[in-house]
Amino acid sequence: MEKFTTHTGVGVPLRASNVDTDQIIPAVYLKRISRTGFEDALFAGWRQDPDFILNTEPFSGGTVLVAGSDFGTGSSREHAVWALKDYGFRAVISPRFADIFRGNSAKQGLVAAQVEQEDVERIWKELENRPGTTVTVDLVTRTVECGDVTAPFQIDDDTRRRLLEGLDDIAVTLGHQAEIDAYEADRPAYKPTTLPARTAG
């Protein structure tokens, strides 16, 4: 997973609350078996409207989504995070996230920055008054900056560490290789053991 320290990109003001995962990516797109190529599925229903924010310049090239409260509710869909990332988003700012979406985001390297509602309102105004304004998400200092607005955001320490170091679940597990080896070495012989990975050929 790619490390995340800070990112600056065009902010996209999405004035919508309770955006669920079916709105982020409709269920019809979940039949695909790959983990990439979902950019066309992101907000597919809403993008039928030519006036939808992502259909207008300069927001179509945005990389920081600024949404309303309760973003990512509904069913657990890693596809929702994949679609956001495939489109080009590196971070989502919201006053509150669904727990499952926040967890899926952390595992895929998408920063879910929880910012107070009043600060989100101020960021929206900056982006709407000056389209093309950039937003900086600084994971080191846990702050977001947009025009004259600088605001702190909440993110738990473990998620922050994993994002900063680029650690997915497998990488975290491999970080305990010595302990795993010691545990396996002490297991009684009659119990199942982990076999070495097979190689082709």
UniProtKB/Swiss-Prot annotation:
InterPro entries: 3-IsopropMal_deHydase_ssu (IPR004431), Aconitase/3IPM_dehydase_swvl (IPR015928), AconitaseA/IPMdHydase_ssu_swvl (IPR000573), IPMI_Swivel (IPR033940), LeuD (IPR050075). HAMAP family: LeuD_type1. Belongs to the LeuD family. LeuD type 1 subfamily. It comes from Micrococcus luteus (strain ATCC 4698 / DSM 20030 / JCM 1464 / CCM 169 / CCUG 5858 / IAM 1056 / NBRC 3333 / NCIMB 9278 / NCTC 2665 / VKM Ac-2230) (Micrococcus lysodeikticus). The keyword Amino-acid biosynthesis applies. Transmembrane segments: none annotated. CDD domains: IPMI_Swivel. It catalyses: (2R,3S)-3-isopropylmalate = (2S)-2-isopropylmalate. Its EC number is 4.2.1.33. GO terms for biological process: L-leucine biosynthetic process. Heterodimer of LeuC and LeuD. Catalyzes the isomerization between 2-isopropylmalate and 3-isopropylmalate, via the formation of 2-isopropylmaleate. This is 3-isopropylmalate dehydratase small subunit. It comes from the Bacteria. GO terms for molecular function: 3-isopropylmalate dehydratase activity. It holds the Pfam family Aconitase_C. Pathway: Amino-acid biosynthesis; L-leucine biosynthesis; L-leucine from 3-methyl-2-oxobutanoate: step 2/4. Keywords: Amino-acid biosynthesis, Branched-chain amino acid biosynthesis, Leucine biosynthesis, Lyase. GO terms for cellular component: 3-isopropylmalate dehydratase complex.
